[in-house]
């Protein structure tokens, strides 16, 4: 189906769409009630913060997304990966409404925005003949994450005392 280099590009796209999940609504929504309880905010307040941060990230994506055409893809992908890692760490340290806004902005921008943008742009550049087939293949990464991450996350949060020993056993 795909040649060696083509397969590497597909795997790259699959991985990036998989990890774009950290900025997707289905994943961030898993923490909604815990965040609202910790910060004593309502559903409406959380929704307003979420929507505002998402809009800001989409506007900035328009400006920064075009940088993928100016920067070597390996360097660009590395920067996006580092930004997502920082975003996840920052998201885990939310302590105020202002931090919540910034954390959601970072997660939406780096995860949903830049990770998926990097995946689709890279794959679209590489494939000319089978572009549709290649893009549909990489988006299986997001579908896989929609199945795997919520289960793994709920398990990890619910059984925190068992998570480390389980990982060490595997």
PLM features per residue range, with description:
Residues 99-113:
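Hydrophobic core of transmembrane alpha-helices in multi-pass small-molecule transporters
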Residues 59-84, 88-91:
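Conserved MFS/SLC helix-loop-helix module at the cytosolic interface between two early adjacent transmembrane helices
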Residues 54-62, 147:
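Residue-level signature of mid-helix packing/kink "hotspots" within the transmembrane helices
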